[in-house]
Regions:
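Membrane transport/envelope proteins' first extracytoplasmic loop
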Residues: 3-392
Length: 393
């Protein structure tokens, strides 16, 4: 009993003798606990917020793109993938008024990766566009905006001036600062917009978006989602592994048919040119024969015949000039045909690329968000160790 009283007495004296240290430790523990709670709930809250947005926007799980687009055979194959919904679309990189700021124009999607409206409305007619929400301070609804395509490239758009109908957020581009690379302007993407699919002047789609049923209920930042998504990506890459060679055969066949028709046209033109040259040579021979007989004619007839010969020579000279121009044009067309044939012969296999949310063009924001959430979670896990180590000092 006496020992217990002595123990409590010593304990009380130790606290009363170092109140400052005791209060410091107590305050540190309280602040640390609050910080720990904040760290522990921040990462789940971030992920919950992002998952809610992905659900609302129906964000894709995987995307397929090809440098030659996706033809009917590709579309049919992708539509047959079990457990996945697929939607095809267009996109192209152009520049804004200053010719340097690159903007990516997407076709309006209906079921996957839909655009979330922030002001105004989505485009409903041709020559209408909804821009990225971070451009609200620079443009207004009802204003017109024009774009330029890369010089020397095949036009991707039917129109280049649009009326702004609203402002949107993308389901795929989460960052407003780091949007990745662009194929136009300065090479850095600065904005995006959405227009109707009918505004694209393209024969084939250039993106397929896929959404899988077994990924719908998973946390997009979880290990389970990443593993299943990776499995689907590998399966999809396997499905598309032979599409490049098959597509190349189709492209070469179509290209060769077109070149053969062009060659046939040039052959006919060359035959006509040779016939024209033959007639010209015959006409020149007749003129020379007539000219040699002028001296045999009486004076009056000789003057009249000489005038006729002079006029005939002029007409013949014009025909000769036309033939020379035709020969030059034919030679140029033959050279073009030979170059096209060489390009067709050297045509590489089309490349098919499968992207996930992080790796697809413009997906840097998703990657940054995922890394930030993981970093906060890691700090929350190690923070208690640091806190108690400091308290023990």
């Amino acid at each position: 009993m006496i020992k217990r009283k002595a123990y409590w007495k010593d304990l009380i004296q130790s606290f009363s003798g170092s109140k400052g240290r005791f209060l410091s430790i107590l305050t540190l523990m309280m602040l640390g606990s609050l910080a720990l709670v904040g760290l522990k709930v921040t990462s789940p809250n971030m992920e919950a917020t992002a998952n809610a947005y992905f659900t609302t926007a129906k964000t894709l799980d995987l995307a397929v793109m090809s440098n030659y687009g996706l033809d009917q055979a590709d579309q049919k194959e992708l539509e047959q993938i079990e457990g996945a919904e697929v939607e095809f679309g267009y996109l192209t990189d152009v520049t804004m008024n200053n010719g340097q700021d690159a903007i990516r124009l997407y076709s309006k999607s209906e079921r996957i990766s839909t655009f979330q409206l922030r002001e105004g409305r989505l485009p409903q007619s041709d020559k209408e566009i909804a821009l990225a929400s971070h451009l609200q301070s620079q443009y207004s609804v009802g204003q017109e905006i024009s774009f330029k395509e890369k010089e020397g490239s095949h036009p991707s758009l039917k129109d280049h001036t649009f009326t702004i109908t609203g402002f949107v957020d993308s389901a795929e581009i989460l960052s407003q600062r780091d949007m990745g690379y662009a194929g136009s302007g300065s090479g850095t993407l600065t904005a995006y917009g959405v227009i109707l699919p009918s505004q694209f002047d393209q024969k084939v789609y250039n993106i397929a978006r896929l959404k899988y049923q077994d990924l719908a209920g998973l946390n997009s930042f979880s290990v389970a989602y990443e593993e299943k998504s990776k499995q689907h990506q590998e399966e999809l890459e396997q499905v598309l592994s032979d599409n490049g060679k098959e597509r190349l055969q189709v492209l070469k066949k179509e290209g060769q048919e077109s070149l053969d028709k062009g060659k046939e046209t040039l052959d006919k033109a060359e035959t006509n040119l040779q016939e024209g040259q033959r007639r010209l040579t015959a006409a020149q021979a007749r003129l020379q024969a007539q000219e040699s007989q002028l001296a045999l004619l009486p004076q009056a007839q000789r003057e009249q015949a000489n005038a006729q010969l002079t006029q005939a020579k002029q007409e013949l000279g014009k025909e000769e000039d036309k033939l020379k121009q035709a020969e030059q044009s034919l030679a140029q067309e033959k050279e073009k045909l030979a170059k096209h044939q060489q390009v067709l012969d050297d045509l590489p296999d089309p490349k098919y690329q499968v992207y996930n949310r992080q790796t697809m063009p413009g997906g840097q924001g998703y990657l940054m968000y995922s890394n930030a959430s993981a970093s906060i979670r890691a700090v929350g896990n190690i923070f208690p160790v640091v806190l108690y180590a400091v308290a023990a000092m």
